């Protein structure tokens, strides 16, 4: 209140002390006369004097939206190859996992490629990264290796079989999953050339060839004629059973060789050598015993009950892990596309400051700026935390039934982990609930990220 205003102020003293209008920091004055007549107490600061924006908001349109609006994300199909069969490569029996179109999609958020995912028949998914092997054996056969994410803190990890398996062998074959992809390649030669280029761009790709000795010795099992002479349309008809039997026999025969190759290649990639084993493939050492095993698988068309007996406990554990990898990719795709997680150059800023997030991002801030499968796993972890926080209070979540092919034991393994935090992520209403419950302000502090980037540059400069 200004005592100089109004006649009543002359009749009685003011209730409050008079404010000196010459004080430059006067919050009550509409204008500050001191500023016009005297220099500033503090130097002016121009935006041109500031450094570059380390944390830009991609897309100007997002600035006009509410804080809870998800960042723009798109899914782009890079290639679709019909007539594909996917097997889990295993020494005892290479179980068929899916049949249908083989699709590679790219998920883009803003200017960043967040993930590249491979999918067969909309049943099995896995990420393609530069530190995971993708190998071409011939015109119809490819195999992929992936290191499944660590299963710490997951509910499904309490399974007694899993615990026993993990205790018995810390460095087991189960640490690497090997997928065998067979393509009905008749009439698809040009499409496969494009596929090879996509794999070169987004994975650790190498072309191999089988030795002539292996081809001659195991022509019936390792031959390519059945699949090469089958088109995607023919795979939907009577030839499907024949091709499926050939696929199971082929990958069962080569299972030990594939595992040896992927393990040795993984060590090379981890060491940073950047070199791959090229030339005549390990298939020159296919043993007579393995060829006999392949012949048995191909000739004996097992019933459902017989298949169940033939699936070993190790195979069951691998099937469970295959499902978890699929769920991981679904969570990343759904989380990014629905706005649950915002990713900037593989920096996940959604849950990092929460207690659960700090447990997941134990390396923050020094090693959070990561690419490849490790960065992909961290994105998945952030979505996992967000999803579990919402789903733990929901009593209405139901799970899908899975089309099981290999008896009750294999079915139980396949169904493992299909709970509220798993396949339920595929429904739109769940994604909406997660987005609604998500706190968009709970992000990594810019100072932490700036420190992380500077430390990373310092390390590179010292090398």
Swiss-Prot record:
Senescence domain segment(s): 269-437
Species in which this protein is naturally found: Arabidopsis thaliana
InterPro entries the UniProt entry points to: Senescence/spartin_C, Spartin-like
Biased composition (Basic and acidic residues): 1-12
Cellular component GO terms held in the UniProt record: plasmodesma
Protein name per Swiss-Prot or TrEMBL: Senescence/dehydration-associated protein At3g51250
Source lineage: Eukaryota, Viridiplantae, Streptophyta, Embryophyta, Tracheophyta
Disordered: region residues: 1-31, 52-74, 146-172
Pfam family, one: Senescence
Transmembrane segments: none
Composition skew (Polar residues), residue ranges: 19-31
